[in-house]
């Protein structure tokens, strides 16, 4: 279980302080596919960077199974990061490395032996449907295939949580459908909790069982996806869903 408690993030810039997250609280249950949706600049990407500890929250807590991740440092922080796989927007693949080498990269950083690395890479490429592209380079892949490599790499260390930043934003409708089906498969087969940051309503509706709407750094509405789509309570949710009052 992930508990976000009163999370805040303030950036200091030359022009002054920018509040990116404000008193954000939510509970994400084990096995959820949890959607975070909002307009551009709402705070979605900052939330993801705080969740995976690339940004230190200014205040509040991020609890993973009761452990406050925001309070960790050093070896404890590195260990906690292994529990969260991240798929960044734009894939972030190593262009001079093969598909297999990209997936193996985090395992080699953790000093797994070659046999263990090879076995895990083989397993993951089979899972994402790219067993026949192990020796290919990213430049030889389609957008959907690159996303599958990014997913396999994010799963390399057996994380409890998979964070996906706009995982379908650059994909055509058919490829989007196949990637979402893969995410469902990963969730069901591996029991991984998935958090999807997106601006695409169709993505949330088709795959997320629970969701939160974020606006100006605040969580303005959250709950069961079907209920929010059927009867949005906040002005922002109604606007996003095309149900604003006339």
For every predicted segment, state its role.
Residues 226-246:
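C-terminal boundary and immediately downstream tail of ABC-type ATPase nucleotide-binding domains
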Residues 2, 8-216, 220-221, 225:
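ABC family nucleotide-binding domain
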């Amino acid at each position: 279980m992930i508990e976000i408690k009163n999370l805040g993030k303030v950036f200091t810039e030359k022009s002054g302080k920018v509040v990116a997250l404000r008193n954000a609280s939510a509970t994400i249950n084990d096995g959820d596919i949890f959607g975070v949706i909002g307009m551009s600049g709402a705070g979605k990407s900052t939330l993801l960077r705080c969740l995976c500890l690339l940004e230190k929250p200014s205040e509040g807590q991020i609890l993973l199974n009761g452990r406050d991740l925001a309070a960790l440092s050093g070896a404890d922080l590195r260990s906690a990061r292994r529990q969260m796989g991240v798929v960044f927007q734009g894939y972030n693949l190593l262009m001079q490395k093969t598909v297999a080498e990209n997936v193996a990269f985090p395992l080699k950083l953790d000093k797994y032996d070659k046999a263990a690395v090879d076995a895990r890479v083989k397993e993951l490429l089979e899972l994402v449907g790219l067993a026949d592209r192990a020796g290919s380079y990213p430049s030889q892949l389609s957008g959907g295939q690159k996303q599958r490599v990014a997913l396999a790499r994010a799963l390399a260390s057996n994380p409890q949580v998979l964070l996906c930043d706009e995982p379908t934003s650059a994909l055509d409708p058919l490829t989007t459908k196949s990637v979402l089906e893969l995410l469902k498969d990963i969730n069901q087969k591996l029991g991984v909790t998935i958090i999807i940051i997106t601006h695409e309503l169709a993505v949330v509706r088709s795959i997320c069982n629970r969701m939160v709407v974020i606006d100006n750094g605040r969580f303005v509405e959250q709950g069961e996806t079907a209920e929010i789509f059927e009867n949005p309570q906040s002005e922002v949710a109604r606007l996003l869903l095309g149900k604003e009052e006339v």
